[in-house]
Amino acid sequence: VVTEVAADTLTNGRTLDAGQTEAAGAIGGTDRLVTVTGPAGTGKTTMLRVARRLLENQGRRMVIVAPTKKAASVAGQETGATASSLHALLHDHGFRWTDTPTGQLWTRLVPGQEDPQTGRIYEGPTRYELDRGDRVVVDEAGMVDLHTANALAAIALDSGAGIAMVGDHLQALPVGHSGAMSLMRSRSSAVVELSAVHRFKDPAWGALSLRIREPGRDAMAVAH
């Protein structure tokens, strides 16, 4: 099924490799928590286009969120999915946070409660409503901190939506408490690792990019 949907979705003769096919199938499947890891250039965006179509064919929706509004906007444009910054989605679902000397303090409003930030009554999510079976895809998930991931998990539990953490845990660390992607990965019922780099025409450059990604394991990557 994934191969057929990919043929209908992708243009210019593009196809998915085995890892992309598995990842698209996992995101378009029924696992509530999915993790897809891989360095830049492994075709995560192309894979997400196909996953979105898989979900749509089932009457389900993909919502892409990212740590920054710009990253979310780019992901939305490239995949055709609804997109938002992760914090905008959390805010829409009632979460509020303030910085304190000991870290961020998170609270959650319930419908009918007054929002202390605006003085208005919070009426529930209005911009990013989620239904059972929808999939929230967290792009650049390696940058998500534990507090934020915990809030998203609560929303998924309440709404019945699934989560897909997509990104490279070795690329960039979050500003807050790190480890969210690793924790989500350990709890995921579907984990896919993308390893084929498509960004470079010369395979040697792709291999080098993978070595640079883990300099601790290959200290000669940069030198050679």
Where would I find each of the regions flagged by the language model?
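Conserved ATP-binding/catalytic motifs of P-loop helicase motor domains
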Residues: V1-H224
